[in-house]
Curated annotation (Swiss-Prot):
Role played: E3 ubiquitin-protein ligase component of a retrotranslocation channel required for peroxisome organization by mediating export of the PEX5 receptor from peroxisomes to the cytosol, thereby promoting PEX5 recycling. The retrotranslocation channel is composed of PEX2, PEX10 and PEX12; each subunit contributing transmembrane segments that coassemble into an open channel that specifically allows the passage of PEX5 through the peroxisomal membrane. PEX2 also regulates peroxisome organization by acting as a E3 ubiquitin-protein ligase.
Keyword Membrane appears in the UniProt entry: yes
Record's GO cellular component terms: peroxisomal membrane
Peroxisomal matrix face residues: 1-148, 223-246, 315-341
EC class of the enzyme, as a word: transferase
Cytoplasmic side: 176-196, 274-283, 366-591
GO molecular function, one term: transferase activity
Pathway annotation: Protein modification; protein ubiquitination
UniProt biased composition (Low complexity): 7-26, 55-78
Identification of the protein by name: Peroxisome assembly protein 2
Residues annotated as transmembrane: 149-175, 197-222, 247-273, 284-314, 342-365
Acidic residues composition-biased segments: 517-537, 575-591
Principal subcellular localisation of the protein: membrane
Gene: PEX2
Amino acid sequence: MSDSDPKPTAAKGAAPTSIPNSTRNPNPTPPNPNPNPNPISTPAPTPTATPSPPIASSSNNGNNSTRSTNIDTNNNTNNAFFQAQQRIAARREAREAAAAARQATQQSASRLRARIAASQSPLLRRLGTSTLSLWDTLTSREGTRPAFRVGQVDAELLDEELVELLRGQVREALRYVGGGGGGGGGGGGGGVGSGVAQDWEAEISLALRAVLFKLTVWDHDATYGAALQNLKYTDARRDGPALAPPSRWQKALYGLVTVGGRYLWAKWEDWLLEQDDGFEGPSPRVKRLARWTSALSTLHASAALVSFLVFLLHGRYRTLLDRLLRMRLAPPTSQVSREVSFEYLNRQLVWHAFTEFLLFVLPLVGINRWRRWLARTWRRTKKIMTADADGGAGDKKGEYSFLPERTCAICYRDQNSASSETELLAAASGGVVGSAQTDITNPYEAIPCGCTYCFVCLATRIEREEGEGWPCLRCGELIKECKPWNGDVLEEPQVKSSPATTKTVVFADDVKAPSDHEEEENEEEEEQQGELGENEGESSQVLVEADPDGGLNDLRPETPSVSSDQADDSRGSESEDYEAEEDGLDEDPES
């Protein structure tokens, strides 16, 4: 090749040829840090002739690993960036679609508004415009943006609770004033709210509401409940950057309706109730007034419901009166952040969960058994300490060992619960007299001590211990069983004293007509009975004491009545026996 031939290389000063991006390597290989100085490729020497040094080999391996790590890192970064770009593009497309849909909706709404505006009816135009405005408000992203609806409702509830609290305190203060109760009390008698508090209940409510209105709304443009919620009454008729307080006539009308209006309405309803006494029906005029009153109450309730629903939507006027007077509750400053503390709520939830846990666990644990075990351990420890102090001597005695046998110790403890050991010792030293309330009923004997209790008392205590034993109140033994009492009631025999006066038995016929001969026989018979009583020491006959003053007229026969013939025969035989005895007595002194 001659020197004049053009060379394939680029001319001096010419621009370098640009390589397209598609042909470029996205991951260019870094230059070799140890380039071969000889560009001519030569065969590799054999290991035996020229062995490679080990240091150079490790350096090449480290470079290769670093190169592969860099390549992986670059690939991961490129993939993450590509995914982020895809997400951004998807969001942009969704936003554009939503904007297009919103624009289409606005166009349709504008066409609907144009049709409504072109309508010839003013009522239809007004209703259509209001409906479309309400729909736009509900479907917009901002919504109605109410000013603390919950806070306004809570403020009203707090105000009512405050009035009820003050009314209850006034009732308690006037509870014992004018206890007679008056005629208009309605028969309350003696309880809370009777007397003056019940007769003047409407006036008391009027005074309380008037005082609260003066100290809250009239002076500070906010009730106590609204102040706790950081709210104040404002005049909604005035537009401006700053909130304007309500005017004096607005507050005056508000107080006149809330205080005086409630009082007058309550008195009006009471008067209507008084006209119906229950015996005779009310007059036609009163019936007509009652119907009008009921209709007015229904109308007011319906209007209040509609107003409250609108309040839930917009959050401007809490009550119907606020809407009529154009007074609304609003925070005084917009810079104050509404901070809600959940400390009380969290504490309440924790205690509620803890109580539920205890109610679930205690029946499984058996708290009564543990309590009985601790009480038994304490009694044993106390008994051991007492025995050591006394030197280990003495019999087993319970805390009610001083009671008589006929007294149930369980009934006595239930009715005379002693608060200390000193009272028990005083009762033991002073003596206890049983009563019908503490006497044993249906006696049962405890096993093994044998102490006697009422069946119901003893069986209840044993069953309550669930087989672990119940300590006897008389001796301290552990009782697990009981049985019916096998004892008897013993009565001491009463010794009859000898009669101090003379007694005799007569028949009814003899009492009616006594003769002289019979009187002599009776005297002789009395003498003989007196001698026999002195010799034998007791009489074997049933005698009736004779009345020395009244004779035998007051006597009553104790023998069965007999006929007159039997009476004559018996009287004759008795007279013969007496004569024989007299003859024998007369012959004895002579012999």
